[in-house]
Design a protein with these regions (language model features):
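Histidine-dependent nucleotide/RNA phosphoesterase domain, centered on the 2H-phosphoesterase fold
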Residues: 1-183
Length: 183
């Protein structure tokens, strides 16, 4: 089963993100746009794991969640990871309690490594992917100027989840396997 650890957002936040995604779509020649219901903050991509491994992962996440307080973040920037001929991933980024988020991320990394999962080598850049393989009609800086984050209120990360990713009817669907409340 293909999985990751993440934090989900409520419908209001997802709808606001979709509003920004709409601006991006209007100013793009091509791209793959994320389904609104799938907007999330990835804390750790696990990849393919065996069903029985979810029990140990769940126990670890429960212990981690009990030690970490809720995290307040602001969605207030747009950026991208570059691809060869296009933007590989267009994302929304955060400010706010990034130090607390970093501590949560590091503990998840260490605990998953202890369970035999691969450690991430790249620096963690917390973000929400809204599009992939994107080719814009306008320069990125012009797109950035069109995006307004004033309607976003502070997002509170209250829980973390082990999330299953599967393809259903040609569309990727994310389903929480287990969810743990932060203290």
């Amino acid at each position: 089963m293909r999985t990751f650890i993440g934090a989900e957002f409520n419908r209001d936040i997802k709808d606001r993100i979709a509003g920004i995604q709409h601006i991006v779509r209007e100013n793009s020649e091509k791209g793959r746009f994320k389904y609104v219901g799938n907007f999330h903050l990835t804390l750790k991509f696990l990849g393919e794991i065996q069903q029985d491994k979810t029990v140990d992962i769940g126990k670890s996440l429960k212990g981690i969640a009990e030690k970490h307080q809720k995290i307040r973040l602001n969605i207030d920037k747009i950026g991208y990871f570059d691809g060869r001929d296009s933007i590989h991933a267009l994302w929304l980024g955060f400010s706010g309690e990034l130090d607390k988020l970093g501590r949560l991320y590091n503990e998840i990394e260490e605990e998953m490594y202890r369970l035999g999962l691969k450690k991430e080598i790249k620096k963690y850049t917390p973000h929400i992917t809204i599009a992939q393989d994107l080719r814009l009609k306008i320069p990125f800086e012009a797109l950035r100027e069109k995006v307004d984050f004033r309607d976003f209120r502070t997002v509170e990360i209250k829980e973390i989840s082990l999330i299953k990713s599967e393809e259903v009817g040609g569309k990727r669907i994310y389903t929480p396997v287990s969810t743990f409340e932060l203290k």
